[in-house]
Amino acid sequence: MEQNIQLDAIDRRILRALQSDGRMTYDVLAAQVSLSPSATLRRVKRLEEDKVIAGYVALIPPERVGLGLTAYLNVRLEKHSEVHKRNPMDLFRAAVLTWPEVVECAALTGEMDYLLRVVVEDMAHYSRFIMDTLLKHPSVQDCKTSFVLDRVKNTTAVPV
């Protein structure tokens, strides 16, 4: 389990501000959190070193780059029965890392083993991914799909 980093109120204000605009200058950030720019810089560097801030990215709406269909796939894997066979979970995890359509993969408790978030151009692209990639993988036993009709809430910010 990861070590829990102690954050004070100023750290939390810095994190909230950077989650809303990761490109703001240290001067602007310092003004927002009521610190000097040098003190703000020190805190941000510490948060980066402690991996509280894991990185900075550009957020790209999939629809703006031709990926208009989002699906959530519940995937069930076969249960391995032979001792010499490689674990189906290991095989599946390695494969998922190579599939560009999969933008998120979570291991689950319950009836299904994994939940995938997949972004594709359209239903034809989805069908190719399912038929030619996912269902042909030797560890996949079953999958069930739900398509996104509307995103009611979509944020990358965590409540700090």
Residue ranges and their predicted role:
Residues 1-160:
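A compositional/biophysical signature of low hydrophobicity enriched in polar/charged and small residues
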